[in-house]
Curated annotation (Swiss-Prot):
Protein name: Photosystem I P700 chlorophyll a apoprotein A2
Organism: Acorus calamus (Sweet flag)
Subcellular compartments: Plastid, Chloroplast thylakoid membrane
Source taxon at top rank: Eukaryota
Residues the record lists as binding phylloquinone: W671
Gene: psaB
Protein family membership: Belongs to the PsaA/PsaB family.
Catalysed reactions, as listed in the record: reduced [plastocyanin] + hnu + oxidized [2Fe-2S]-[ferredoxin] = oxidized [plastocyanin] + reduced [2Fe-2S]-[ferredoxin]
GO biological process terms on file: photosynthesis
Protein's job: PsaA and PsaB bind P700, the primary electron donor of photosystem I (PSI), as well as the electron acceptors A0, A1 and FX. PSI is a plastocyanin-ferredoxin oxidoreductase, converting photonic excitation into a charge separation, which transfers an electron from the donor P700 chlorophyll pair to the spectroscopically characterized acceptors A0, A1, FX, FA and FB in turn. Oxidized P700 is reduced on the lumenal side of the thylakoid membrane by plastocyanin.
Cystine pairings recorded for this chain: none
Length: 734
């Protein structure tokens, strides 16, 4: 008999129902559960798949470069970045009528095009690319890297080139390689690119391979490096009247500490960024030589962890046993990696707008909004994934004997205290924040707006003042001209920083008031509740009071049969599932806040946010309804415009989102009954009954239906907000 899907599980392959297909898809990437899997094959498969992942990433980025070079307007955008709309790619759509063709023909293009809101134009411009030829060269190079990655993946699946398990578990060598080889060397290489290509380009000098060795990045060459006069590299920086991309007002410095923003581009100084990357390269190149490998020198991570016993004796055995626990658990390692990456991604969202690194991106408002929202949603999914794999670690990989009385065991021992404190914080934040909002709504509805409870965020204002914002009148740290902190930086980075913090043309330390105070606490509620669900899911993954044997049922299970009460909906997977809803909800509030505050700043009517954000009706009416009115109006038989497709996507997103509820608010028995009825009718209908199926149709399992519902909810939610965000911002600012 021919092998049926899934080949990795003979048990499933012999299942006579459609469960075979869905369970096969669900467990396709759960390598640990496959037939004939060994630890060695598990590690080798994952390692090889990383090369495939890299190939896809390189191919995708190559495609971005290629399509902009082929169909974009990069060269004309470079001439006038503030007024030419960057084109992502052409649209070839047989459904477009004449009005659509006209609506989407923009940016100087001959036919319909999509505008780029990704920020790639600003990025490529900042790093020194200027022509379509540059873009094609980059696309070809990335295509080459993609091919190399595929070859690498194939190579490491061949018997001769398969690494051993001991190679994968050599943590010190891997850390040294990643710290020095990846972070250190790549940061150094990036510094080199900025100094040799990007900074000259910002001063009107075109450096390419043909003149790379002839153009000195600094008039004195390597002299100051070898003579120890490094400060010479910081002398004569670009002036405040410098026109980016030209020699007008340009200096000769390559590594500076100016602080603040380039006045014309409103982005960080390129010479500051080169300096920053050089410092990071230096730190990581040292860090990558700290761990003991072949030469018998340096730290052993295991020794470090074993030696760390907390003083006083009241915190148990500290980190004893952690080295082997982490090193032998891929889920633990993945959980740590995802947690770090999630935090970094959210920080990228925050810093891309507050400290823009790319020239002119701060004045491209739609791109700013899209970038912030994009990175926050990605951070949310990554962070929930971190806790999911933490829970799987506790179920599959945690060994109580190995971790007796260490930090992991103690987390489990006092999980009730952790969970109840998170619960208390969530309840406190929720009731008080909602109470304040609702009180304010009642006051406005009853005609006494002066009775609103409006709380000034004085602690946050004090922190902003400590960083140099003078508006609030606190005389503290950097906003105090007599203090040592102020005087220490006065001759280098401080003037640039202080002018950036105190001028209102950027998003650095925005002025905050009672509306910000309220939404800050609403977001804190969302974050604490999401964390509560995720932490409880992981800490209760092995067992809870109602179900002490939970770990025996695995990561995702619906119930322990109908006869055992209190076992439904409490698997670690269910916690992850619930947390994703809260995560989406929270990031909704975060992005609403960011977008509304910025729209009013960009339009110069910030009082609208300040006055309307203190009560719920204000958010619904003056943010959501006011900014979606064009989308709700949409398209009609008499015409359309370039927002019509966003209006269609806004509608479509709502439909996908609503479809999720069909799976979420229904029971399996209903679907099973429906399927039985349809199958019965099919088998008794002439002609139709000539078509048979090999697999008996059965309803999705409870867990699978939840996943399908969650997927539709998430995708619809994000599609809807993406359409709203891009249309409402580009409709106002282009």
């Amino acid at each position: 008999m021919a092998l049926r899907f899934p080949r990795f599980s003979q048990g499933l392959a012999q299942d006579p129902t459609t469960r075979r297909i869905w369970f096969g898809i669900a467990t396709a990437h759960d390598f640990e559960s496959h037939d004939d899997i060994t630890e060695e094959r598990l590690y080798q498969n994952i390692f090889a798949s990383h090369f495939g992942q890299l190939a896809i990433i390189f191919l995708w980025t190559s495609g971005n470069l290629f399509h902009v070079a082929w169909q974009g307007n990069f060269e004309s955008w470079v001439q006038d970045p503030l007024h030419v709309r960057p084109i992502a790619h052409a649209i070839w759509d047989p459904h477009f009528g004449q009005p659509a063709v006209e609506a989407f023909t923009r940016g100087g293009a001959p036919g319909p095009v999509n505008i780029a809101y990704s920020g790639v134009y600003q990025w490529w411009y900042t790093i020194g690319l200027r022509t379509n030829e540059d873009l094609y060269t980059g696309a070809l190079f990335l295509l080459f890297l993609s091919a190399i990655s595929l070859i690498g993946g194939w190579l490491h699946l061949q018997p001769k080139w398969k690494p051993s398990v001991s190679w994968f578990k050599n943590a010190e060598s891997r850390l040294n390689h990643h710290l020095s080889g990846l972070f250190g060397v790549s940061s150094l290489a990036w510094t080199g690119h900025l100094v040799h290509v990007a900074i000259p380009a910002s001063r009107g000098e075109y450096v390419r391979w043909n003149n790379f060795l002839d153009v000195l990045p600094h008039p004195q060459g390597l002299g100051p490096l070898f003579s120890g006069q490094w400060n010479l590299y910081a002398q004569n920086p670009d002036s405040s009247s410098h026109l980016f991309g030209t020699s007008q007002g340009a200096g000769t410095a390559i590594l500076t500490l100016l602080g603040g923003f380039h006045p014309q581009t409103q982005s960080l100084w390129l010479t500051d960024m080169a300096h920053h990357h050089l410092a990071i390269a230096f730190i990581f190149l040292i860090a990558g030589h700290m761990y003991r490998t072949n030469f018998g020198i340096g730290h052993s991570i295991k020794d470090l962890l074993e030696a760390h016993t907390p003083p006083g004796g009241r915190l148990g055995r500290g980190h004893k046993g952690l080295y082997d626990t982490i090193n032998n658990s891929l889920h633990f390692q993945l959980g740590l990696a995802l947690a770090c990456l999630g935090v970094i991604t959210s920080l990228v969202a925050q810093h891309m707008y507050s400290l823009p690194a790319y020239a002119f991106i701060a004045q491209d408002f739609t791109t700013q909004a899209a970038s912030y929202t994009h990175h926050q949603y990605i951070a949310g999914f990554i962070m929930t994934g971190a806790f999911a794999h933490g829970a799987i670690f506790f179920i599959r990989d945690y060994n109580p004997e190995q971790n007796e009385d260490n930090v992991l065991a103690r987390m489990l021992d006092h999980k009730e205290a952790i969970i109840s404190h998170l619960s208390w914080a969530s309840l406190f934040l929720g009731f008080h924040t909602l109470g304040l909002y609702v009180h304010n709504d009642v006051m406005l509805a009853f005609g006494t707006p002066e009775k609103q409870i409006l709380i000034e965020p004085i602690f946050a204002q004090w922190i902003q003042s400590a960083h140099g914002k003078t508006l609030y009148g606190f005389d503290v740290l950097l906003s105090s001209t007599s203090g040592p902190a102020f005087n220490a930086g006065r001759s280098i980075w401080l003037p640039g920083w202080l002018s950036a913090v105190n001028e209102n043309s950027n998003s650095l330390f925005l002025t905050i008031g009672p509306g910000d105070f309220l939404v800050h606490h609403a977001i804190a509620l969302g974050l604490h509740t999401t964390t509560l669900i995720l932490v409880k899911g992981a800490l209760d993954a092995r067992g809870s009071k109602l179900m002490p044997d939970k770990k025996d049922f695995g990561y995702s299970f619906p119930c322990d049969g109908p006869g055992r009460g209190g076992t439904c909906d409490i698997s670690a997977w269910d916690a992850f599932y619930l947390a994703v809803f809260w995560m989406l909800n929270t990031i909704g509030w975060v992005t609403f806040y960011w977008h509304w505050k910025h729209i009013t700043l960009w339009q110069g009517n910030v009082s609208q946010f300040n006055e309307s954000s203190t009560y719920l009706m204000g958010w619904l009416r003056d943010y959501l309804w006011l900014n979606s009115s064009q989308l709700i109006n949409g398209y009609n038989p008499f015409g359309m415009n370039s927002l019509s497709v966003w209006a269609w996507m806004f509608l479509f997103g709502h439909l996908v989102w609503a479809t999720g509820f069909m799976f979420l608010i229904s029971w399996r028995g209903y679907w099973q009954g429906l399927i039985e009825t349809l199958a019965w009718a099919h088998e008794r209908t002439p002609l139709a009954n000539l078509i048979r199926w090999r697999d008996k149709p059965v309803a999705l399992s409870i867990v699978q239906a939840r996943l399908v519902g969650l997927a539709h909810f998430s995708v619809g939610y994000i599609f809807t907000y993406a359409a709203f965000l891009i249309a409402s911002t580009s409709g106002k600012f282009g």
